[in-house]
Amino acid sequence: MARTRSKFIVPGILAVVVICCAIVCTGGILLYFFGDALLALFSPTSPIAVETPVVVQETPGSDSSGLPEWTIIVYSAADDEVLEENMWFDVNEMEVVGSTPQVNIVVQMDRYQGAFSGDGDWTDTRRFLIRKDNNLESITSPIVQSVGEVDTGQPQTLIDFVTWAVQNYPAKKYALVMSDHGGGWTGGFSDMSASSYSELSIPEIVSSIEVIRQNTGVDKFELIGFDACLMGQIEVFGSLYPYSNYMVASEEVEPGYGWSYAAWLEQLVQNPTVNGDGLSQSIISTYVINDVLLTGGRASAEEIAQEESTTTLSAVESAKVPDVIGAMNLFLGAITEMDQSLVAQARTYTRSYFSLFGEEVSPSFIDLGNFAEVLTTLTDETEIQQTAIQLQAAISSAVVAEKHGPNMSGSNGIAFHFPDSDLYYYTEYNSDFPPYYAESSARFLEQSVWDEFLAYHYTGEAFAPQDGVAVAPSRTAEIVAPGASEMNVGPVQISDTQISGDETVTVTSTVEGNVAYIHTALYFWDPESESYWIGDVSYYIADNMITIDGVNVPDYGASPIQVEYEWSPTLYSLTDGEHDSYILLEPAEFQSSDGETVYQV
């Protein structure tokens, strides 16, 4: 990135410096998906012939002593323009290791028509028994079955494949890995080629696994993993823990290349007797840093570190998820007694993750443990302090493995959905967003009082926990934002109207209100289009900061806030060495754990 400096003339009619204040509620919502496509690195080859599987039926309670230790079942919903090539390469990574007498690796992959054209450009849905090879340019494993074009966003597709995999490749332990886009409690694993867009909701994944249990007699998967974005949420874990011993997922978005399959599968085939705890440890310890796409000189150590800096991945022991929900319930009961504007403040300052609903609303996916930690800094109430400690202890006990990059400090392994008032309306009142949060997260909410708390927090409804029920708010009740306030920004004063080179001007103003963050923005007036273009948006760095669980937040002091800072005429551009292009960097993190202010394109 190049910093471009040039002489600036700053009369008020040509450029305007604006002070912007972030509070608790904003509007405008759009559902986003995340993923990065690979570069077109590999040449196409022809598909190979179908191989017929040997069917071995297993009945519940039958002797499994002669069976392989593991069958790894990968549901690769790659019928997606963005992620197809990445997910195709993941299967090539699996072939670096391949199946062994003790570890079966079985993949169903549905490709997209019109995106990645490599490896014969096939677009149907194929099932592979992964065999070892060193060819990263094509999938050479035998096609055990071709099932034509199927809709991977339909529950029956998941049911059919996993049932088939268990019946044809029985083992002592099973791992189900679901790979594609993810969206936490909203679900994921879509099919972009379907006649109408489809994806699997969390209730549909749950019901699919229940049918798979009936079909196969497998009571629990040793591990359920989501190689997908944003699935590391209590809403997801709280819905699926009865069906597994361990679960692996990420609180934050994942890079497009996903998990480091070759690395953790190699550890598994070297020690196949490990349980889900051991397998989880391998998946997480190898994440990013051992990915075939990055290793072997394909990326520098600095580039790998940069990739890892914004990632998260965690594993939870399923049997301990109810303890987390129980501790969360006690904590929520305690914080109903405190000023709800302080709860809103804690939500704003908690470690947050990618905003699935767009940049115009506050991020709603935040870390559960960090939220409890932040709240303890805002009150001295003994019950809140004690229940926060209990919740953090329950999370620590349930999370058996976790890693996060330096820019993701405050991540403890389990996130949850805490919307601001606008998003609460959108996901609970707006008929254009079916299904509602209460319906999508029903399995979790039936055990939790989080739904009752949200209704209390935003509508003032009495906090009345109802066991075994997912509570939807009274949709006639008025929603009130507890942290919202009147906001006033005084006149912006600039010490000079002409600067150049490394010179600066002093900008001063006064801000009144319940302020979370202060941004400064530079606008240029374009007389031809009669509109402004944005030159720069920056954080106003407070003189004092508070650090909570590694997360830095500003301490502006009491309102009114006196703003004074030195502004320099800096614009940014991207260059490839030959061409430069101006870019707008938007604020992403106030200050990371290493003291750096983070911006993103």
PLM regions: where:
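Gly/Ser/Thr-rich loops at beta-strand to alpha-helix junctions
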Residues: 79-82, 180-186, 225, 229-233
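Ser/Thr-rich, Proline-interspersed low-complexity disordered segments
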Residues: 21-25, 38-63
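Terminal, contiguous helix-loop blocks that mediate binding/assembly
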Residues: 56-65, 190-226, 231-601
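Short, solvent-exposed loop/turn and secondary-structure capping segments
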Residues: 85-87, 117-120, 186-191, 236-237, ...
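Extracytoplasmic mature domains of secreted/periplasmic and thylakoid-lumen proteins
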Residues: 148-218
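Structural recognition of the beta-strand scaffold that forms the well-ordered cores
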Residues: 71-75, 104-109, 174-178, 222-226, ...
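Membrane-embedded alpha-helical segments of small multi-pass membrane proteins
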Residues: 7-36
